C-alpha cells in the first residue's frame, strides 16, 4: 500500500481558503473544513478490502453502469427488426414485382441512424443537469425521456415517421446516459478500481446487445406486431432497474463538495469504500477533492470558452476525447453490430439471427475480460494492442470477402468455406475490440477532464461518437451496395491512424487519481513516457511504493486477507 508524502494541510471553508503547511495535529473532523483542522496525510493507507468490500463496491456501481444497457439493447433489437417481415410490412414499401415488403436503403439507414442523432443531441442537452441537479437525479430524468421514446415507437402503426420521432427521443435518453453514467462511475470509483468500474458501462452495453439479439430471435416467428413490439416493450424493465438503483447508489463526492455539502461527500466516500465517514483515509480523500475544487474556483466560473484553453491543457484533452470517441466508431464495430444479421445472410447463412447471437456472446464475455484486466495492463497498451489486432482481423475479413466469397462473381453462389472463415475472423475482431477499445474509450473520456468543465467536455466528446455512429449507420447500406467487402479496407486505414495517434498523443493514466491526472497534463509529460510519471505527492517514496496501490488478484480470488 502507498502512503502520501504530502505535508499536512490546514483547509479553511470557502473558495478563498488558504492552504498552508502545518504540523500534524489529530483533531475531530467537523462539517465543512473549518479553521485549524488538519488531516495527517502521512501514513494514511486506503482501507483493506475483503470479499464483502469488493462486492459492495461493484454492487453499488452496477446500477449506474446499467445505463450502458440502453443503447446496447437498441443496437441488438434494431439489427433484427430490419429483417423482420411484419416490421417491413408496417414501415417499409411494397414491391409489386416480387409481392414482398422491403426497406429502402434510405429508410433502413435512417432507421438505424436516427437513434444516434438523438443520442448526440441528448448528451449535449442533458449533461449540464449533472452540475445543476446532481449526477443521480440527472440519470433518472434521462431514463424517463428514454421511456417516452419507447412509448412513441410502440404506438406507431404503419407510420414510419412517428416511429422515427420516437427513435430520436429514445436516443435523447440513451445519449444522456452515455455521458452521465461514466461520469458518475469515474467520480465515485476508488482509484485502483476505476478502470474496471467504468468498463462495467461497456459490459452492460454488450449485455444489452446480446439480450437484444436473443429477444428478436425469440419473436422472429410471430406473424403480427408482437414480432417487434415485445422487444421494445421490454425496455421498461431495464429502465426500472436504473431508477430503483439510483435510490441506492452514492452521489458524486466531487459534486457534493462543489455544492459545499462536505458531510454528505464524506458519507459518499465512506459508503463506496465501506468504512466510517470519520476514517482518516476518507478525510484525506475529501481533503484532496476539496483542494482540487478550490484550485478550479480560483480560475473563475466554467464556460464554453474555457474548453479551448491552451494554458490549462483543456483543449488538448478535448481533442483527445473527441478523437478517441471518433476512433471508437471508425474501428468498424457497428458495421457488424447494426448489420450483422444482414451481413451473414449475404455470406450464405440461412439464419443470420443465430450468428448474431454468437457474436453477441463473444462480445459480452470478451468485455468481462476487459473489466478484469484494464486496471492491470493500462490504457495505452490496451488501445495499441487492440488497434493492431483489429487491423489484422479486418484485413483478413475484407480480403476473404473480396477474393474468395463469390468465386463465380457477385451473382453466383457464395463459398460456404469462405463464409465460415469470415465469421471466425469476425469473432476474433470482436474479441480484440471488446477487450480494448470498447471499454477504454469511455474510461479515457471519463477521467481526462477537470470537474469544472467535465460535463461540457464529455458531452462534446460523446456527441462525436454518436455523430460518427449516425454517419456509419446511415451510409453503410449505400457503401456496401456499391463496393461490397472493400468497405473493410476503409476501416483498416482508420485503425492505422488510431494506432499512431494513441502512441504519440495519449498519456497513460492507470493508478492515478482524477486530481493527479490533471497534474499529469499540466506538466506536459510526453505520452510515451507517461507510464513512469510519479505525482508530486508521491515523489521521494521508494520506487516499489511509488504507484497507487493495485489489487492483489490472488488475494482477491482467494479472499484470504482483508477486513470488511
Curated annotation (Swiss-Prot):
Transmembrane segments: 53-73, 110-130, 137-157, 168-188, 195-215, 230-250, 334-350, 357-374, 382-402, 425-445, 463-483, 485-505
Organism of provenance: Saccharomyces cerevisiae (strain ATCC 204508 / S288c)
Extracellular face residues: 74-109, 158-167, 216-229, 351-356, 403-424, 484
Compositional bias of kind Basic and acidic residues: 1-12
PANTHER family in the cross-refs: GALACTOSE TRANSPORTER-RELATED, PLASTIDIC GLUCOSE TRANSPORTER 4
Protein name: Hexose transporter HXT17
Membrane topology: Multi-pass membrane protein
Top-level taxon of the source organism: Eukaryota
Higher taxonomy: Eukaryota, Fungi, Dikarya, Ascomycota, Saccharomycotina
GO cellular component, one term: cell periphery
PROSITE patterns per record: MFS, SUGAR_TRANSPORT_1, SUGAR_TRANSPORT_2
Main location: membrane
